[in-house]
């Protein structure tokens, strides 16, 4: 495999010295870019885009052609695992992801298979290999998965949810059923992420988008426990380098200490966390990723720069910070504003690494 020309993202995740703070954006390959919309139209629909390795590679690389980003992230979806389990993922216009066969009973969970990542999810591994080859060592490639809890919310609710009443009914009325589902999902995520690492992903991230919907006790039992199991079972070295693992729970700022105990290398922060406070609490154990409000990219360039400066000052001198948004970039953000953001992070962060 080609040597990395820019490894500052990997170094920052391991709290090693860097010259400037690395930056990438969640959903950096996406609908805010006109070239993405053109490629998606060529593919026909979202899942066809995910399943075509050449087109998935193209959209992964598109933001790197525009911006001096320090990492690429695999273009895929968190719901590939439930789809591979046979739930029948589809996308309803204006409603987001849905499943033809949601989980409604203990029997449904018992019969769920654990997918083979090189078979049912082989298209994802083909995309990883294709992207890695085309990156030619410019920047590292991030692989990812949804967390067991977050995947379970979609599988039990049948799609997106605001109140999570269906899965919480299962959690409180049939906890054994939910634990069986989460255990199967954790096993599936372990196989899936390890296959991505073998295929060429140089870092991995677990997205726990809906962990913040839980109470502290329930979060530890139904979400964090299973992410801990995943971290314990991941291949942490490949091609002679450590493969860093980042955990991100949206709305999880109150649980950073518990998250840091999992043995992960970094924690993602959403914009509701104060990065200075987070560093005081867990900065001796993990790197931190984040955490500008994605809506700040609607502001004028001077305001975006001001916010970047504020977050850099909050983290302070030294290593262990990967700059990012606190969640995915919005689809109607002007692409030039994303450019202002990336350039400002690099220019303003140099003083913090002197």
Curated annotation (Swiss-Prot):
Site (Transition state stabilizer): 77
Record-linked PROSITE patterns: UROD_1, UROD_2
A GO term from the CC aspect: cytosol
InterPro entries: UROD/MetE-like_sf, Uroporphyrinogen_deCO2ase_HemE, Uroporphyrinogen_deCOase
Cellular compartments annotated: Cytoplasm
EC number: 4.1.1.37
Family annotation (NCBIfam families): hemE (TIGR01464)
Oligomer status and interactors: Homodimer.
Protein name (database record): Uroporphyrinogen decarboxylase
Source organism of this protein record: Pectobacterium atrosepticum (strain SCRI 1043 / ATCC BAA-672) (Erwinia carotovora subsp. atroseptica)
